[in-house]
């Protein structure tokens, strides 16, 4: 069991190494992205006086008022690709989003802000992307047909979230405002959306066939195939607690999010971990085969011989781990199993001193490693298949040794009766 523990420890270390490489790639390419849909913001100034030691002092307070949209519709395409770093393949993506929004501010109550001087001619859009380093092209905003450029980044009070800021435009509250936003950004592992507005819908498609939908809401509809996936979310005002208007950063607009993780169903290290869990089963079944030959041929084997066979099986897992990093799990399993079966069969030919017995043992070992491979491909029935294999082997040992005089084993191999 100690070698098995060491094997699992090695797999964990290699897996952590890959995770470190993934983080390095994400820092330079783009982290997991979280998108905050655009909102309108207008700055304000407020002049007031305070009592000083000798005289009144005039101060000016600055801030901004935020307006959430009535409706938001996001259509996005997320294209995935694999980047090679060292011996690892890292999954990354490039996302292109088209966002259409409607703002109806004619009924918004601004009476609580009457004391402020609102600068409607300096209104601007803000659009949140959690990792601005991943932005791959210039953002574009169109407000009622007027094209606005992006002017840089603004942050919230904590400085932890950044938003792309558009060039200013004049806001007319009496008119309905239609906004179109185009963006393209890169990222890794996942993309999520933070809904704002009374009505919010998102349509995302990608060629990646292994999505995992996460967050505060699952898709209303999705379609997954080998060609990729399409998903659709829709929320109404009852599922979205963001108000129509608020001051500064007094409202947490990041309270809920939903999206998709781009998962690799089972990478080489995951497959190796599953394989290592069957190490004890492989060793037990292999020893059982040797024990059957020991009984049938009336030729006791030394414990050292069992240890050497067990060591060969342990090396099988080391070969599997190291080869799978370079040529993939399936080919690594084939090469490692053939090498291990060949080594054990060659060694056994000298122990058994019988070509027929060696061929039978080689066939049984091939069947064992082939059966274990089939178990590893299963998801729901792996435990059942493994249990059945162990049961059949125990039953075979019991039946083949049913006539053995176990007490006679003490007097030497010549006394064994079958």
For each feature predicted by the language model, list its residue ranges.
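Hydrophobic membrane-insertion alpha-helices, especially the h-region
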Residues: 1-4
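Alpha-helical transmembrane signal-anchor/signal-peptide segments
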Residues: 6-30
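Catalytic cores of large soluble enzymes that bind and process phosphate-bearing ligands
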Residues: 10-13, 17, 91, 280, ...
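Intrinsically disordered or highly flexible coil/loop and linker segments, enriched in small
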Residues: 16, 31-35, 108, 380, ...
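Soluble non-transmembrane domains of integral membrane proteins
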Residues: 16, 20, 27, 53-256
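Short extracytoplasmic
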Residues: 23-50
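Cytosolic-side membrane-insertion boundary helix
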Residues: 249-283, 302-303
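Generic detector of multi-pass transmembrane helix bundles and their immediately adjacent loops
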Residues: 280-418
